[in-house]
């Protein structure tokens, strides 16, 4: 991804750094509308997730996470922008005439061919079961449940690594640093997700953040005591506590939020690194 810096004529362009624009011309049969109800509200209209609202209207692109077009070669026709994710997407024309969107693998260019199946070459963009991959393979779009489609390592620049295979399970190291077991029959795509430099972007101004549907974040220390435990005081007062807390009084730093007794507890060999 190429980072584009604007000429420093205004404060917003002086601090902004955006990626080079990848145009989007979605196919009608591969898009559908979205109905965002409430933007962070529940069925009663009460805010359950803060700092959400507004944003530009979006059309959802139907992404093929299952990669179930077995042994049919496809060609990358376009690389497009998707407003619903930070990774780019590719339009694939398959040999049987079908057209699908997939996540753009890093390094893939227009004209490359891809295929999914059981005995396909270990090539960037190809999808195959973990049992057919050699150890050390970099993968993304990984299934957790067989046939459900990829659910892990789908963000821009995400990549996991196949580190072991034993019995019916394969051991993966995920982008978060977590090491967990997954069935060897689950499929994954070879390579890394594209748009690696997405973290180098700087929106530069508040309006760009609002376009993404993210509302301003107000610090608790500038609120009133009725609104936040950090609020109140005369002038610029400290929070008045040993440690910061959330608006509901729970510890804000270091508290583990993962639920106990989850089904995947026995599958996780090492927790993600912080």
From Swiss-Prot:
It holds the Pfam family Ribosomal_L2_C. InterPro entries: NA-bd_OB-fold (IPR012340), Rib_uL2_dom2 (IPR014722), Ribosomal_uL2 (IPR002171), Ribosomal_uL2_bac/org-type (IPR005880), Ribosomal_uL2_C (IPR022669), Ribosomal_uL2_CS (IPR022671), Ribosomal_uL2_dom3 (IPR014726), Ribosomal_uL2_RNA-bd_dom (IPR022666). Signal peptide: none annotated. GO terms for molecular function: rRNA binding; structural constituent of ribosome; transferase activity. One of its GO terms (biological process) is mitochondrial translation. Keywords: Chloroplast, Plastid, Ribonucleoprotein, Ribosomal protein. It is found in: Plastid, Chloroplast. Residues 1-21, 225-274 are annotated as: Disordered. GO terms for cellular component: chloroplast; mitochondrial large ribosomal subunit. Belongs to the universal ribosomal protein uL2 family. Part of the 50S ribosomal subunit. This is Large ribosomal subunit protein uL2cz/uL2cy. It comes from Lepidium virginicum (Virginia pepperweed).
């Amino acid at each position: 991804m190429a980072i584009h810096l604007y000429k420093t004529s205004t404060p917003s362009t002086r601090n902004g750094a955006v990626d080079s624009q990848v145009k989007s011309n979605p196919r009608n049969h591969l898009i559908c509308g979205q109905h965002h109800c409430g933007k962070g509200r529940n069925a009663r209209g009460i805010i359950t997730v803060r700092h959400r609202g507004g944003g530009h209207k979006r059309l959802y692109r139907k992404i093929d996470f299952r990669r179930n077009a077995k042994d049919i070669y496809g060609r990358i026709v376009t690389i497009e922008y998707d407003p619903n994710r930070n990774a780019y997407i590719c339009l694939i024309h398959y040999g049987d005439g079908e057209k699908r969107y997939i996540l753009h693998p890093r390094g893939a260019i227009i004209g490359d061919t891809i295929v999914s199946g059981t005995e396909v070459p270990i090539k960037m963009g190809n999808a195959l079961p973990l049992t057919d991959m050699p150890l050390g393979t970099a993968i993304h779009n990984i299934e957790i449940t067989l046939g459900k489609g990829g659910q892990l390592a789908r963000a821009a620049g995400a990549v996991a690594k196949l580190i072991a295979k034993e019995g019916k399970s394969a051991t993966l190291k995920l982008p978060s640093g977590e090491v967990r077991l997954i069935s060897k029959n689950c499929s994954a795509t070879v390579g890394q997700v594209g748009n690696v430099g997405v973290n180098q972007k700087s929106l530069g101004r508040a309006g760009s953040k609002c376009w993404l549907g993210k509302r301003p974040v107000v610090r608790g220390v500038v609120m009133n005591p009725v609104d936040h435990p950090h609020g109140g005081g005369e002038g610029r007062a400290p929070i008045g506590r040993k440690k910061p807390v959330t608006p509901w009084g729970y510890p804000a730093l270091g508290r583990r939020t993962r639920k106990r007794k989850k089904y995947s507890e026995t599958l996780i060999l090492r927790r993600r690194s912080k």
